[in-house]
Amino acid sequence: MVLRSGICGLSPHRIFPSLLVVVALVGLLPVLRSHGLQLSPTASTIRSSEPPRERSIGDVTTAPPEVTPESRPVNHSVTDHGMKPRKAFPVLGIDYTHVRTPFEISLWILLACLMKIGFHVIPTISSIVPESCLLIVVGLLVGGLIKGVGETPPFLQSDVFFLFLLPPIILDAGYFLPLRQFTENLGTILIFAVVGTLWNAFFLGGLMYAVCLVGGEQINNIGLLDNLLFGSIISAVDPVAVLAVFEEIHINELLHILVFGESLLNDAVTVVLYHLFEEFANYEHVGIVDIFLGFLSFFVVALGGVLVGVVYGVIAAFTSRFTSHIRVIEPLFVFLYSYMAYLSAELFHLSGIMALIASGVVMRPYVEANISHKSHTTIKYFLKMWSSVSETLIFIFLGVSTVAGSHHWNWTFVISTLLFCLIARVLGVLGLTWFINKFRIVKLTPKDQFIIAYGGLRGAIAFSLGYLLDKKHFPMCDLFLTAIITVIFFTVFVQGMTIRPLVDLLAVKKKQETKRSINEEIHTQFLDHLLTGIEDICGHYGHHHWKDKLNRFNKKYVKKCLIAGERSKEPQLIAFYHKMEMKQAIELVESGGMGKIPSAVSTVSMQNIHPKSLPSERILPALSKDKEEEIRKILRNNLQKTRQRLRSYNRHTLVADPYEEAWNQMLLRRQKARQLEQKINNYLTVPAHKLDSPTMSRARIGSDPLAYEPKEDLPVITIDPASPQSPESVDLVNEELKGKVLGLSRDPAKVAEEDEDDDGGIMMRSKETSSPGTDDVFTPAPSDSPSSQRIQRCLSDPGPHPEPGEGEPFFPKGQ
């Protein structure tokens, strides 16, 4: 009841974050009495400089202290006769110095995690204010509290930031980088990252040098190289800040990859410019050779970092081939090789960020094909957790370091820096987008340009680079650091808090949270192959052509070396299908929909009953050459012959439409069949004279109807109405009987004469030639009997039109 009603009328949702903050601050009490994260001397130094201390219970791994007569414990319960006094056995001891550093680090991480939980418990705050802003505020409060009790707050050391906090964030971004969107927009990203960063650095440095000349006595002594160095530090977009803000607003994939890709790839430009101007500041005179070497160092730093990352990525992929028997250590290789790539690049002053991105992109497809799904899940969640904790610590220590650092405020310099940063960003984006849209198919709209310009956030990288400046060579480094912190706070707080309402106000397209299906993958690969073929036909080799070449090389050579077993020969579509099936199975398990699947106990029992045997590969029987040739011959003779296909496109060898050609062939076959059927019918009927068309027959009958009028009654042909065109429906028996009945009513002599004629059969007479200009007309002979005349008339005129007195015309079957 107390939990439901709350305490003093307050809901538990409001009490819980407050309790988290109180617990975190109470846990930081030992830190308030210490010197923050400043590493203390080693244990051996502490023990040698301090007086001998009491050995605690937990101190079991260190060597025992030297025992001296003065340090031996005294036992007051023993008499002085023959025995020395000693102290009582210590039951409990406190030794904070021994666990100081790991204890404080754990407390800071615990504070960061509790703050993240507290922010997401209160949805009203997290929906308005970005998480990075809240973490900076927490850092400011903790730093002010530490300073308020008279202690020195911990400061974010540059080595700690670059060697321990930044690599997890970059590795997480590089390993799970959306490679398709990144490669399709690589040209645009490189222009923004290289040309845009150079423009911001030189534009801001030149204008700040002009401000220093007219700004007053405090900033008159800042030279051109110092301002250019300051411009190179403050001009780069920070990937940590961009990730923290853009992940919350769920912007569409195009804008996200453009801004985030720029923040990743501008590291090479920032590193080169920083070291270049730092070295030039110590020179009395800078020549053309120095400028050329500085320009050359950009390619060395960028390409060298990529090369280092590729080498370590290939080594990691090759190592994962042999981890099938030791699945536990599979995720460790990914972390170690990636971190070694970063450290190796930093060792030679190359771009460590480029090395991390290259190693993650190269190793991922081959490592995922070799490792188990559990290892893949471990890598995914560990990287997400590690990067999230590092990002939280960076923003907290950014606030703490703001309180702890020494600052030098100058209104003219700070306000001019903030104003010129915004102007340089807007002008750079507008100018570069105008040039880029000339070559892009999908143009960047004014809304997209506004989001790209507004999303240029600065963060802890600029702060750490500013902190690295040596005060001996750069006396105004405190002023630089103050201006950098001001720009960071403005971009994170003002731009970070207002970018979400602006995205909603401008109705910018957001990211669609849809699951990728196998149908989408099939259509994507189909379109890729189609565009590759179109590029080959047109003779224009774009990125689809080179992507297809790279995929063929990867499938033919690289996969065989870096992927173990039969997975190297598995098509990409089948691999994607297996991946989708595994993902759906995991989602089914997590959702609790496993009612119909056997439990773990039944599965284990079935495995015990039926022991697992090694999978045996199906071996097809080998065919002899004679048998194979016989099969080919049978197929060639019985299968339909396929049409010949042209191997290449040529305007002189265009083929007809296959559908039109097939239709024409079908019409020709039908016409030939009709002609053959007509020939067969004509052969069977054997007409006595030339056949007339129905039109000529009607005209002839109409001109002389008496010549064709029957002089006696004709026999009636009975036709089955169910099948009027069937010759089987004619009743020849009834027809003969009807003829005999009709003959009884006439003269017996005539009937006998007709019977004799009928017995004589039908005589085929040759037709006399008619005179020119007259038609061939059938004229019955006077000596012919009526039945003979009827049969001859039917044979000579098989037309469809009936004679007078007849019923429906008779059509033979098939006509």
From Swiss-Prot:
Site residues by UniProt (Not glycosylated): N370
Pfam families: Na_H_Exchanger, NEXCaM_BD
InterPro entries the UniProt entry points to: Cation/H_exchanger_CPA1, Cation/H_exchanger_TM, NaH_exchanger, NHE-1-like, NHE_CaM-bd
Interaction with TESC: annotated segments: 503-545, 633-815
Stretches with biased composition (Polar residues): 782-791
Glycosylated residues in this chain: T42, S56, T61, T62, T68, N75
Main location class: membrane
Phosphothreonine: residues bearing it: T603, T779
Domain of life: Eukaryota
Gene Ontology MF annotations: calcium-dependent protein binding; calmodulin binding; identical protein binding; molecular adaptor activity; phosphatidylinositol-4,5-bisphosphate binding; phospholipid binding; potassium:proton antiporter activity; protein phosphatase 2B binding
Effect noted on mutating A173C: Reduces activity
Cellular localisation: Cell membrane; Basolateral cell membrane
Impact after mutating L156C: Almost complete loss of activity
Region (Disordered): 42-79, 744-815
Residue span of region Confers pH-dependent PI(4,5)P2 binding: 540-545
Catalytic activities: Na(+)(in) + H(+)(out) = Na(+)(out) + H(+)(in); Li(+)(out) + H(+)(in) = Li(+)(in) + H(+)(out); Li(+)(in) + Na(+)(out) = Li(+)(out) + Na(+)(in)
Residue list for modification Phosphoserine: S599, S602, S605, S648, S693, S697, S703, S723, S726, S729, S785, S787, S796
Membrane topology: Multi-pass membrane protein
Disease in which the protein is involved: Lichtenstein-Knorr syndrome: An autosomal recessive neurologic disorder characterized by progressive cerebellar ataxia and severe progressive sensorineural hearing loss.
Other remarks in the entry: Predicted models used for more than 20 years predicted 10-12 transmembrane segments. More recently, the structure of SLC9A1 has been solved and reveals that SLC9A1 possesses 13 transmembrane regions.
Homology family: Belongs to the monovalent cation:proton antiporter 1 (CPA1) transporter (TC 2.A.36) family.
Record function comment: Electroneutral Na(+) /H(+) antiporter that extrudes Na(+) in exchange for external protons driven by the inward sodium ion chemical gradient, protecting cells from acidification that occurs from metabolism. Exchanges intracellular H(+) ions for extracellular Na(+) in 1:1 stoichiometry. Plays a key role in maintening intracellular pH neutral and cell volume, and thus is important for cell growth, proliferation, migration and survival. In addition, can transport lithium Li(+) and also functions as a Na(+)/Li(+) antiporter.
UniProt xrefs under NCBIfam families: b_cpa1
Name used for this protein in its record: Sodium/hydrogen exchanger 1
